[in-house]
Amino acid sequence: MGSSRLMITFIVVAMLAISSDLFSVQIGISVQAAPPTCGRDCTEKFLTQDCDKYCVGLSYKKGVCILSEGLPPKTSTYRCCCS
């Protein structure tokens, strides 16, 4: 009788430990950041080199200033996009 209680307790503890690990893995996957859409504007002072440094600081490989056409009235601006 005592050994069966010990075995049941061991099984319950093992199941809780396994489910806890699976839960933490699921949380880690759901929290990962998605790549940003094109962010801040590129200007004469904030050029492609600055955009590249900005994106590398956000853990992306590179950044490029891309022409982004706005909605009417047409306001085209250069935006810093990370990839």
Swiss-Prot record:
For this protein, the record's InterPro entries field holds:
Defensin-like_dom
Q: Which UniProt keywords apply?
A: Antimicrobial, Disulfide bond, Fungicide, Plant defense, Secreted, Signal
Would I find Secreted among this entry's keywords? yes
User: Under which name does UniProt file this protein?
Assistant: Putative defensin-like protein 66
Q: Name one Pfam family in it.
A: Defensin
According to its UniProt entry, the protein's GO biological process terms are: defense response to fungus; killing of cells of another organism
Location comes to: Secreted
- A cellular component term, taken from the record's GO annotations: extracellular region
Family as reported in the entry's similarity comment: Belongs to the DEFL family.
> Which segment of the chain is annotated as a signal peptide?
1-22
